[in-house]
UniProtKB/Swiss-Prot annotation:
Limits of the Alphavirus-like MT domain: 72-289
Known function: Involved in the virus replication. Contains a helicase domain and a methyltransferase domain. The methyltransferase domain is probably involved in viral RNA capping. Involved in the formation of ER membrane spherular invaginations in which RNA replication complexes form.
Bias (Basic and acidic residues) ranges: 553-562
EC number: 3.6.4.-, 2.1.1.-
Protein name as catalogued: Replication protein 1a
UniProt lineage: Viruses, Riboviria, Orthornavirae, Kitrinoviricota, Alsuviricetes
Domain (+)RNA virus helicase C-terminal: 839-993
Organism: Tomato aspermy virus
Record: residues binding ATP: G714, V715, A716, G717, C718, G719, K720, T721
Gene Ontology BP, a term: mRNA modification
PROSITE patterns according to UniProt: ALPHAVIRUS_MT, PSRV_HELICASE
Coiled-coil boundaries: none
Family affiliation: Belongs to the bromoviridae replication protein 1a family.
Molecular function GO terms recorded: ATP binding; helicase activity; hydrolase activity, acting on acid anhydrides; mRNA methyltransferase activity; RNA binding
InterPro entries per UniProt: (+)RNA_virus_helicase_core_dom, 1a_necrotic_phenotyp-det_dom, Alphavirus-like_MT_dom, CMV_1a_C, P-loop_NTPase
Length: 993
């Protein structure tokens, strides 16, 4: 929020609030500041607080986070400790905002002890370490599974592709690496040193967290966090609270079977609520109040307390590499609640032998003493004076009348203490009165008074100053028996020094992160600069203009006789090739390394997801068994992924295996891999084809290819597959596709069958070539190349030792898409040596030309070049598109002569279910109902696009998805939709044609 350079209040005070000029100026500045605040609030992140909060709680949360977030207090539901829960959400978002983002994706962040379902619902790139330390943790995991299941059932379009990212391992045992971590009230069970050890295990350099805080914990045994309405209390080992109603036998059993009571505990109880309380070891909580640094395995971790407000402390821990010279680290803990109090010693019991110190307001003590002094008299019985003091302390009115004078009553005193407090005040007052009287009598009767009276005033002032300097604490000694001055803060001093003989092995640090970011930025800038010069540096032969229509089946002489790139003895690995002065070679090596890392990440993700499910079902790393509630746990996962299943040693599956599905691997205590029929193991969709590890390892075995890559970038239906058929020469070529569906289509078009030896030999997927033996070829023909990662294309060329790759695709249709949103993808786009464009379609009817041009003008940014802006059609069909509103899936016109497309898997599943209800053929259900992504490359006479939801779906706004959907047909296209969807690009453009 912008701050004004003027102080409005001072301006009014100096110029007068009634002056016309001053008033106008003040009004203008006030309006500007208000406008800035409103605009800032509109730009801020909207945070919806569903917990019902009273007025005071609402002010507290707005006071702490109202300036940062656009808070919406919806008052939807009554929740336990509502303010604490609402603050916890804001604390989580605040801590996440402390860390950098890469583009639109946030860097991977760890969460120690957090709620993984919160991150799942918001789509955060966060891995949660949520160990099951007891039954309470298992209860929370079960509750979160139910929450996940509910949101998936209610909104499958949004959550069907999300996978919760968490593990059930303690933070110190988890091996996920990340620079940043948050701990929202997760440090109570770990302590400061435990958090540091966990940070070291994860290679983390920066932690930000929150916890409940009260400085009085350092000297009191119990206290109260007023804003949070939370009472805390220390529980000493082997002792019992007076409120503890646990049966005696249970207490004895607990003492014999557990060691938790060997430590002093601290309990947090929320007042007027019967929810479960929080109990932690006091030594762990205390460490955040007293500790400052911790050295562990070559790293020094420093704790800094950032903000303490409304009973919540925000802190950060930063890992520091290198030798640390000696430095005095000092911090203070302030007790703001004590500034208005004084300690008063009172008797514990009636025998007046034992005494304790209680806190009492200074104003109460002062006013009570004043009343006591007014009523004090040697002739009055002490009991009468005692009654007067007790009357003041126990008064229910805001004012009391003593000797005809109105006085303010003090703070309410605990009923069990106020008698003793009154006695202590009486004794203290009497002692003061008598001591002062004796001092005056003694002073008045001595020669010192007469001596001082004879001195001049300057001399008296000088002697008084000398006495004060020599005797600064001159006061009645016995006063300390009743009053104790309470310090408003405590300090902790520590000398931090780390001196190692060897250099520290810094896994990751903030400096390293910054250095890498700078290097990446420079490298990207250099790549952009050299792209324009790449063609002139490495001259290549041009493809003739009639490539798409050429019927010459023999390879061109320039292809077979192309000179190879000069190789250097130093370029023996992909890593060294990335530093090659030949830009093209460095780009290809970088893309191959990225593709290998990406496939390895997919494999690790699959293992992590399976391991999480195995642990959630009660499995471990030693025994081949799961808990009895396995169906309850896997029900939720089965909704997200229908291929999630459990294989029992008897050969039985928990769910029926879908027809045509065969699992190649499974997961149990031995990890992922092929399993025997007599084993207990779990599976999911990643277990059907588990080839990521093999693809990652195979790619690293080859160097970047030096051959020429040519791209024919054609519009939909321009005859790319026809051109491949004409160019194919079995003596020198192999045809590569991105997926199995495309391979089957090309085999059918080329050989009129899909499973013959010739068809499977000459038309193969890129995965098949990398994973299996294959013959070397001179030329590779690639269909739908935009669906391939550039690194995989290079790996295929390198394995086949091809000198040329002729690639066909549409750069404006759906391209390669990462299945891991956290992976920083930079080199996936194909970088050809030469490009030819085809802008004539033979498939799409004439009215589709207008529809696509309309979509391009609406969806693409102004100034974006698109070949569809000038594309033309050779089709004789003039009118093909239509739109139809339907009430539900039962109203969709399903016929086996049409091809059906959906944007989402949920709509696809609904259509297939409806087709089964109508007893339609399995061939139609399996092969003629597809998603848009699965339909890329398909060509059909009659196509129907179906939308069954009106909930927000960004795919209907994306030009590339809408383009694929409306360009699959030759004769007719029908858009059947339920209701109206805001931003529906296809519906808007169909209405204009």
């Amino acid at each position: 929020m912008a701050a004004s350079a003027f102080n409005i209040h001072k301006l009014v005070a100096s110029h007068g609030d009634k002056g016309l000029l001053a008033s106008a100026l003040v009004d203008k500045l006030a309006h500007e500041q208000l406008e800035e605040q409103v605009q800032h609030q509109r730009r801020g992140l909207k945070v919806y607080i569903r917990n019902a909060l009273d007025v005071k709680d609402s002010e507290i949360i707005r006071d702490r986070y109202g300036g940062k977030y656009d808070l919406h207090l919806t008052q939807q539901e009554q929740a336990p400790h509502g303010l604490a829960g609402a603050l916890r959400l804001c604390e989580l978002l605040d801590c996440l905002d402390s860390f950098p983002r890469t583009g639109l994706r946030q860097d991977l962040v760890l969460d120690f002890g957090g709620s993984w379902v919160t991150h799942y619902l918001r789509g955060h790139n966060v891995h949660c370490c949520s160990p099951c330390l007891g039954i309470r943790d298992k209860m929370r995991h079960t509750e979160r599974l139910m929450t996940m299941r509910k949101v998936i059932v209610n909104d499958p379009d949004t959550f069907e592709s999300r996978v919760p990212d968490f593990c059930t391992l303690p933070a110190e045992d988890c091996k996920v690496q990340a620079h940043f971590v948050i701990s929202i009230h997760g440090g109570y069970d770990m302590g400061f040193k435990g958090l540091c050890r966990a940070m070291h295990a994860h290679g983390t350099t920066f932690l930000k967290g929150t916890m409940m805080f009260d400085g009085a914990m350092l000297f009191d045994t119990e206290g109260y966090l007023a804003d949070l309405k939370c009472k805390w209390k220390k529980i000493k080992p082997r002792t019992y609270e007076s409120e503890d109603q646990t049966p005696l036998l249970s207490r004895i059993s607990d003492n014999l079977t557990t060691t938790i009571k060997d430590h002093t505990l601290i309990a947090f109880d929320f007042v007027d609520e019967s929810t479960l309380s929080y109990v932690h070891k006091w030594e762990n909580v205390k460490s955040f109040l007293t500790d400052q640094t911790y050295s562990y395995k070559g790293m020094t971790y420093g704790l800094e307390r950032c903000l303490i407000q409304h009973g919540i402390m925000t802190y950060k821990i930063i890992a520091v590499p290198g030798t640390c010279p000696p430095e005095l680290i000092r911090h203070c803990i302030w007790f703001t609640s004590l500034k208005d109090y004084v300690g008063l010693k009172i008797p514990v019991s009636q025998d007046l032998v034992e005494w304790k110190t209680v806190r009492i307001l200074i104003s109460t003590l002062r006013e009570t003493e004043e009343i006591a002094m007014r009523c004090y008299s040697d002739k009055k019985n002490w009991l009468e004076q005692f009654k007067v003091i007790l009357g003041v302390l126990s008064s229910k009115s805001s004012t009391i009348v003593i000797n005809g004078m109105a006085m303010q009553a003090g703070e309410r005193i605990d009923t069990s203490d106020y008698h003793y407090i009154g006695l202590a005040i009486l004794l203290h007052t009497r002692m003061k009165y008598e001591q002062l009287g004796r001092m005056y009598d003694m002073w008045n009767s001595t020669f010192i008074r007469k001596f001082f009276a004879s001195l001049t005033r300057p001399m008296r002032v000088f002697l008084s100053a000398c006495v004060k300097t020599l005797f600064p604490t001159l006061r009645p000694r016995d006063e300390k028996e009743f009053l104790v001055k309470l310090s408003t803060f405590v300090t902790f001093n520590e000398v931090c020094q780390v001196d190692l003989d060897a250099e520290w092995d810094v896994i990751s640090s903030a400096a390293f992160t910054a250095e890498m970011a700078v290097e990446d930025g420079k490298r990207l800038a250099e790549d952009r600069k050299q792209k324009a010069e790449a063609a002139s540096q490495i001259p290549v032969d041009e493809i003739p203009d009639d490539t798409a229509e050429s019927s010459d089946d023999t390879p061109r002489e320039a292809d077979t006789n192309q000179k190879s790139e000069p190789s250097s003895p130093e370029l023996e690995t992909l890593s060294t090739q990335t530093r090659s002065p030949i830009t093209r070679l460095a780009q290809r090596a970088s893309s191959m390394l990225e593709y290998s890392a990406y496939e390895a990440q997919l494999h690790d993700n699959a293992v992590s997801n399976l391991d999480r499910m195995w642990c959630m079902a009660g499995g471990d790393k030693k025994n081949n068994r799961l808990e009895s509630n396995v169906k309850f746990v896997f029900e939720t996962y089965h909704i997200v992924d229908p291929l999630v299943n459990v294989h029992f040693p008897t050969g039985r599956w928990l769910y029926r295996v879908p027809e045509g599905i065969s699992y190649s691997v499974g997961f149990n205590e031995h990890g992922i891999g092929p399993k025997a029929d007599g084993e207990l193991y779990i599976v999911n969709a990643d277990c059907v084809i588990s080839n990521s590890k093999c693809l990652a390892d195979t790619t690293l075995q080859y160097l970047a290819p030096t051959g020429t890559i040519s791209l024919v970038d054609g519009v939909a239906g321009c005859g790319k597959t026809t051109a491949i058929k004409k160019m194919f020469n079995p003596a020198t070529d192999v045809i590569v596709t991105a997926n199995k569906k495309s391979a089957l289509d090309v085999r059918q078009a080329l050989f009129n069958c899909t499973d013959s030896k010739e068809a499977t030999t000459f038309v193969r997927t890129a995965d098949s070539i990398l994973m299996n033996d294959t013959n070397e070829v001179q030329r590779v023909l690639v269909d739908e190349v935009v669906l391939l990662h550039f690194g995989q294309l290079c790996a295929v060329m390198s394995k086949l030792k091809a000198v040329r790759a002729i690639c066909f695709g549409d750069s404006e249709q759906i391209a390669f898409c990462s299945r891991d949103a956290s992976f920083d993808m930079r080199h996936s786009t194909i970088i050809p040596d030469e490009t030819d464009t085809a802008d004539t379609t033979f498939r799409s009817p004439q009215d589709v030309i207008k529809v696509v041009k309309c979509m391009a003008s609406k969806a693409l940014k102004k100034g974006t070049h698109s070949k569809y802006a000038s594309w033309v059609s050779q089709s004789k069909v003039q009118r093909s598109v239509s739109s139809k509103a339907v009430a539900s899936v039962t109203m969709v016109d399903l016929t086996e002569d049409r091809f059906y497309i959906t944007m989402t898997q949920a709509d696809k599943t609904a259509l297939r279910t409806r087709a089964r209800e109508l007893n339609m053929s399995n061939d139609f259900i399996e092969h003629r109902i597809k998603t848009t992504h699965e339909s890329q490359g398909v060509s059909e006479d009659h196509v129907t696009l179906v939308r069954l939801k009106t909930t927000k779906c960004d795919l209907f706004k994306a030009f590339k998805y809408c383009l694929v959907a409306v360009t699959r047909h030759k004769k007719t296209f029908r858009y059947e939709h339920v209701g109206k969807l805001d931003g529906d690009l296809i519906a808007e453009c169909l209405a204009r044609v």
